[in-house]
From Swiss-Prot:
Residues 80-241 form the CP-type G domain. Its main location: cytoplasm. Monomer. Associates with 30S ribosomal subunit, binds 16S rRNA. This is Small ribosomal subunit biogenesis GTPase RsgA. It comes from Flavobacterium psychrophilum (strain ATCC 49511 / DSM 21280 / CIP 103535 / JIP02/86). Binds 1 zinc ion per subunit.
Amino acid sequence: MTGIVYKSTGSWYTVKSLQGHFMECRIKGKFRMKGIKSTNPIAVGDVVDYDLDENSDVVTGTITKIHDRKNYIVRKSVNLSHQMHIIASNLDYVFLLITINNPPTTTNFIDRFLVTAQAYGIETILVFNKIDTYNEAMLDEQLFMQYIYQEIGYKCLRVSSTEGKGIEELKNIMKNKVTMFSGHSGVGKSTLVNAMEPTLHLKTKTISEQSKQGQHTTTFAEMYDLSFGAQIIDTPGIKGFGIVDMEKEEISGYFPEFFKLKDQCKFNNCLHKDEPKCAVKDALEKDKISYSRYNSYLKILEGDDETYRTDIYNDDRIASDETRNK
């Protein structure tokens, strides 16, 4: 039998058959995908074959094959730094939910996510959530951040789950697609799913007043069928986003504004760091490239996985950019 993995708890997988029936399945022994060193061999979104095991009181299944994936998105494993964790597979879009505060989402985190999604062939749409909660200064910051990413070709949406702003536009994009919500804990992923599909009643939790960080409410990634013809994968909140399996020379290729300037650099293997006659650094000096994006690039290049909590909006360079672009 063939089906799609709707939920993974690490040892058991909920699979929906092509006939619409759900079955709890597991794997036997080691199950590895060719060329992929991951902590989880099977991910939500995978198309799998499975056999029924009817020898027990409760009928379960055993997964025997994973079909080739159209794509998948990964991050560095929390416990095993040299291995990856597959978040989900076979996606049409990923929606990265961003909040300016409660909790804050930094450009470093956004850029690391975008680099990984681009590397694995997944289109990302940035969703600025909770816009109804921002004061004037926060709205200015949100609009400036949106400007940075729209300028380099990323689609951006502004939504409010509580007031319903932007919900219909989001639903129109999701219709007949398999998509995923991702972002920090507390950015409102489950709340947004509930706003689109109130009958789901996904569990939500408020932000910790002490840490201003979200608290996990989604424990495992899980796919849901929505009434307007969409399939959404809700994922646990991500604190950091470690990048794996990427050579230094290829990183700039996943920054669209860097990639289009690469042929103008003096050296073919230019890392846009210390080299002379670098078109990217020249564009940076002329304010044609965002300083926050360049800073993120350097952090990724240096293998610094600890910068996702900080941002550089208070940097004088950023402040002057904001004033100039308004």
